[in-house]
From Swiss-Prot:
Pathway noted in the entry: Isoprenoid biosynthesis; farnesyl diphosphate biosynthesis; farnesyl diphosphate from geranyl diphosphate and isopentenyl diphosphate: step 1/1; Sesquiterpene biosynthesis; Isoprenoid biosynthesis; geranyl diphosphate biosynthesis; geranyl diphosphate from dimethylallyl diphosphate and isopentenyl diphosphate: step 1/1
InterPro entries: FPS1-like (IPR039702), Isoprenoid_synthase_dom_sf (IPR008949), Polyprenyl_synt (IPR000092), Polyprenyl_synt_CS (IPR033749)
Keywords: Cholesterol biosynthesis, Cholesterol metabolism, Cytoplasm, Isoprene biosynthesis, Lipid biosynthesis, Lipid metabolism, Magnesium, Metal-binding, Nucleus, Steroid biosynthesis, Steroid metabolism, Sterol biosynthesis, Sterol metabolism, Transferase
Keyword Nucleus appears in the UniProt entry: yes
GO annotation terms (biological process): cholesterol biosynthetic process; farnesyl diphosphate biosynthetic process
CDD domains: Trans_IPPS_HT
Catalytic class of the enzyme: transferase
Tissue: Mainly expressed in trichomes and flowers, and, to a lower extent, in leaves, roots and stems.
Protein family per UniProt: Belongs to the FPP/GGPP synthase family.
Source superkingdom: Eukaryota
Gene name of this polypeptide: FPPS1
Location in or out of the cell: Cytoplasm; Nucleus
Name the record gives this protein: Farnesyl pyrophosphate synthase 1
Catalytic activity, as annotated: isopentenyl diphosphate + dimethylallyl diphosphate = (2E)-geranyl diphosphate + diphosphate; isopentenyl diphosphate + (2E)-geranyl diphosphate = (2E,6E)-farnesyl diphosphate + diphosphate
Length: 340
C-alpha cells in the first residue's frame, strides 16, 4: 500500500508539471509559481482515499495485477477526483468562513491570497478537464468520463446549495427532517466521495454505467452511512483524534444528531434544542450535547450503524458479479466502525 501511495504521488508530480506547461496559456514565471504553490497547497494534502480507491477498484474489477500504464491512468483519474475535492473545499471554506483545513490555514486565509482563492477554485476545476484531455482523449470512454465528472460536479454543487440555504436565515428547527438530511448528504457527499471512484474504474474496464445503476445506489447508501458517522464523530469524538474541531451545533447544521434528537424529544427537550442549537456560546453548545447524551444518541447511532451495515452487506451480496462485490466490500471495510 505504501508503494502504491508513492506511485500515486509520483503521478501527481507528472500531472502538475504538464499543467504548468499547458500550451493553451502563456505562463510567466510569476503565474507558474502561483499555480504550483496553489496546487501543492490544496490538492495533495488529504488522506487521498478517493483517489487511491480508483486504483483499488480497477484492480479488483480486472482481477489481475495492473500494468504500469494502467496504474498511471487509474492514478490520473484518481487525481482528477482529488482535484475536484480541492476545488470544492477551496470555495466551501470561503462560503463557510472557515479558518483551518487539514491542520493548516484555509487557502483564502493565507497572506496575499484572500479572494484570489475564488478564481483559484475555478482554475482547479479546469485542471480536471485538461488532465482528462491530455490522457484520455483517444479512449473510447472519453465522452463518458466528461459526462460523469460534469454530472457529479452538478450534483455536488446542488447538494452544497441545499446545505447552505437550509442553515441560512432564521434558525428554525422545524425545517429539519431526516429526508432533508438524506437529500443534502446524497448530493453533497455521496456521489463524489463514493460513486465517482468506482464509476471511473468501471469506465476504464469498458463497462457502461447505465448497466450499473444498482452499484450507484449501493454506493449512495454507503455515502449516507458515512456522513451519519461523520455527524456523530463531529460531536462525540475528541477533536485531537478527529483532526478537526466539530462545529455542527454552532453552525446550525442539519446533522443526523439534531434530526434524531427532534424525533425523540418531548416538548421540554425540544425547548432546550430551540433555545440552544445554532448558537456559538460554549454553554449553549454544552446544553445541546448534554441533551444528546440524555436521549442516548450514542445508543441510537450504534443501532443505526449495525442496521446500515447489515442492509449494505445484503445488497452487496445479492450483486451477480463477485468482482463488483469485492469492490463494494472493500469500500465498506474502510469505513465500518471508523473512529475518525
Amino acid at each position: 500500500m505504501a508503494d502504491l501511495k508513492a506511485k500515486f504521488l509520483n503521478v501527481y508530480s507528472v500531472l502538475k508539471s504538464e499543467l504548468l506547461q499547458d500550451p493553451a496559456f502563456e505562463f510567466t514565471d510569476i503565474s507558474r509559481q502561483w499555480v504550483e504553490r496553489m496546487t501543492d497547497y490544496n490538492v495533495p494534502g488529504g488522506k487521498l482515499n478517493r483517489g487511491l480507491s480508483v486504483i483499488d477498484s480497477y484492480k479488483l474489477l480486472k482481477g489481475e495485477e495492473l500494468t504500469e500504464e494502467e496504474i498511471f491512468l487509474a492514478s490520473a483519474l484518481g487525481w482528477c477526483i482529488e482535484w475536484l475535492q480541492a476545488y470544492f473545499l477551496v470555495l466551501d471554506d470561503i462560503m463557510d468562513n472557515s479558518h483551518t483545513r487539514r491542520g493548516q490555514p484555509c487557502w483564502y486565509k493565507v497572506p496575499k491570497v484572500g479572494m484570489i482563492a475564488a478564481n483559484d477554485g475555478v482554475l482547479l476545476r479546469n485542471h480536471i478537464f485538461r488532465i482528462l484531455k491530455n490522457h484520455f482523449k483517444d479512449k473510447p470512454y472519453y465522452v463518458d468520463l466528461l459526462d460523469l465528472f460534469n454530472e457529479v460536479e452538478f450534483q455536488t454543487a446542488s447538494g452544497q446549495m441545499l446545505d447552505l440555504i437550509s442553515s441560512e436565515g432564521e434558525n428554525d428547527l422545524s425545517k429539519f427532517s431526516l429526508s432533508l438530511h438524506r437529500r443534502i448528504v446524497q448530493y453533497k457527499t455521496a456521489y463524489y466521495s463514493f460513486y465517482l471512484s468506482v464509476a471511473c474504474a468501471l469506465l476504464m474496464s469498458g463497462e457502461n454505467l447505465e448497466d450499473h445503476v444498482d452499484v450507484k445506489n449501493i454506493l449512495v447508501q454507503m455515502g449516507i452511512y458515512f456522513q451519519v458517522q461523520d455527524d456523530y464523530l463531529d460531536c462525540f469524538v475528541d477533536p485531537k483524534i478527529l483532526g478537526k474541531i466539530g462545529t455542527d451545533i454552532e453552525d446550525f447544521k442539519c446533522s443526523w444528531l439534531v434530526v434524531k434528537a427532534l424525533e425523540l424529544s418531548n416538548e421540554e427537550q425540544k425547548k432546550i434544542l430551540n433555545e440552544n442549537y445554532g448558537k456559538a456560546d460554549p454553554e449553549k453548545v454544552a446544553k445541546v450535547k448534554a441533551l444528546y447524551k440524555e436521549l442516548d444518541l450514542e445508543g441510537e447511532f450504534a443501532d443505526y450503524e449495525s442496521k446500515s451495515y447489515e442492509k449494505l452487506i445484503t445488497s452487496i451480496e445479492s450483486h451477480p458479479s463477485k468482482a463488483v462485490q469485492a469492490v463494494l466490500k472493500s469500500f465498506l471495510g474502510k469505513i465500518y466502525k471508523r473512529q475518525k
